[in-house]
C-alpha cells in the first residue's frame, strides 16, 4: 500500500498512542520524522527517541511522556500543510500556537525548526504541524 502522507500518519500514530496511554510507539523511519521527533523531545512533549537501524528503512521508537497523575503532555497534534494543499509562512507571519503554549513545526532552509526558533533566525517556510 502506498502512503500518500507519511507525516500525517506519524502524527496520527502519536495521537492514537497518546489517547490510549501507550508508553512506546514504533514507526517506519524517515529523515523528516526523525526531525519532528527530535523537536518534540527538545520541547518536552515526549521522553525520548531512538532510531533503530534494521538494514532497510529503519524504525523510530518514540517514548511518550505523561504527567505525574497520568495526564497527557500532548493535548493534540494537527497536520497543517498537506500534500494537496501546502501552507507556507513568510518570516514576518510565522504562526503562534495558542499564544505560545504550543509549537508550530516549520520546515525552513535552516532545517526543521519550531515557530520560536524560526522567528529568532528570521526565516519562514512550510508549516508542517501544530502541537499543543
Curated annotation (Swiss-Prot):
Domain of life: Bacteria
GO cellular component: ribonucleoprotein complex; ribosome
An annotated Gene Ontology molecular function: structural constituent of ribosome
Keywords carried by this UniProt record: Ribonucleoprotein, Ribosomal protein, RNA-binding, rRNA-binding
Pfam name, any one: Ribosomal_S8
A GO biological process held by the record: translation
InterPro entries to which the protein is assigned, alphabetical: Ribosomal_uS8, Ribosomal_uS8_CS, Ribosomal_uS8_sf
Function: One of the primary rRNA binding proteins, it binds directly to 16S rRNA central domain where it helps coordinate assembly of the platform of the 30S subunit.
Stated family: Belongs to the universal ribosomal protein uS8 family.
Subunit structure: Part of the 30S ribosomal subunit. Contacts proteins S5 and S12.
HAMAP family: Ribosomal_uS8_B
Protein name (database record): Small ribosomal subunit protein uS8
Organism annotation: Streptococcus equi subsp. zooepidemicus (strain MGCS10565)
Native organism taxonomy: Bacteria, Bacillati, Bacillota, Bacilli, Lactobacillales
Amino acid at each position: 500500500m502506498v502512503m500518500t502522507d507519511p507525516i500525517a500518519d506519524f502524527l496520527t500514530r502519536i495521537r492514537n498512542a497518546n489517547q490510549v496511554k501507550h508508553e512506546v510507539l514504533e514507526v517506519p523511519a524517515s529523515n523528516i520524522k526523525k526531525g519532528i521527533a527530535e523537536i518534540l523531545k527538545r520541547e518536552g512533549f515526549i521522553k525520548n527517541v531512538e532510531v533503530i537501524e534494521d538494514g532497510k528503512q529503519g524504525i523510530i521508537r518514540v517514548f511518550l511522556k505523561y504527567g505525574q497523575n497520568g495526564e497527557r503532555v500532548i493535548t493534540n497534534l494537527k497536520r497543517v500543510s498537506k500534500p494537496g494543499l501546502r501552507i507556507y509562512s513568510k518570516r514576518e507571519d510565522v504562526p503562534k500556537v495558542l499564544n505560545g503554549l504550543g509549537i508550530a513545526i516549520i520546515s525552513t532552509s535552516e532545517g526543521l525548526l519550531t515557530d520560536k526558533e524560526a522567528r529568532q533566525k528570521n526565516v519562514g517556510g512550510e508549516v508542517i504541524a501544530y502541537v499543543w
